[in-house]
Amino acid sequence: MENFICKIANEEEMKIKWDYEIEISDNKSNWIIWKDENIDRFKKGLIIPYYGLLDGKIICEATAMLNSEIVQNSDGLVGNGVVYLSAFRTNKEYQGKGYFSKLFKFMIEDLKEKGYEKVTLGVEPEEIKNKKIYNHYGFNEHIKNSKEVYPDGTEIEVEYYGKSLK
């Protein structure tokens, strides 16, 4: 892990990572929209993209969403010292090696330093592995269940959880 660094991404790094996600995706249309939305949100200061780089290559990411207007079902998930986390992704060949855990700790410390008191996230009910990981990270407070809609109209069920940073 000595060549692994955690950082807040810049716009150029975001473009590289989003292009990678588009390239490996089966449904490119959603990913193209999400790329444009997130780069615009970054420019407006509405998100903080956290990246993990190994030997200069982006291998994992997470995004803190700071504004209720950009989070679906945002009531109780973002605002007043609460930030919504999304886009937890690690390139397949680096999964299970502790890289994302290091990035997650970096992100949480940065958000604490910025004054946030709670973080929230959403997970699909059938994503049992992810739910166990999030529980391990301390997301034990069930907030609510709801539906989210992708740009192409696909609806998904989502369970929302919170973690105190105090």
Q: Where on the chain are the PLM-derived regions?
A:
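Conserved N-terminal entry element of GNAT/NAT acetyltransferase domains
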Residues: 1-18, 165-166
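Acetyl-CoA-dependent GNAT
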Residues: 8-11, 19-87, 91-93, 104, ...
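Short hydrophobic/aromatic beta-strand or adjacent loop that forms the aromatic wall/cage
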Residues: 47, 155-162
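Active-site acidic-Proline motif in GNAT/NAT acetyltransferases
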Residues: 91-93, 97, 125-126
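Conserved active-site alpha-helix within GNAT-family acetyltransferase domains
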Residues: 101, 126-143
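Conserved GNAT acetyl-CoA-binding A-motif
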Residues: 111-123
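Conserved beta-strand-loop-alpha-helix junction that forms the acyl-donor binding cleft
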Residues: 121-131, 148-152
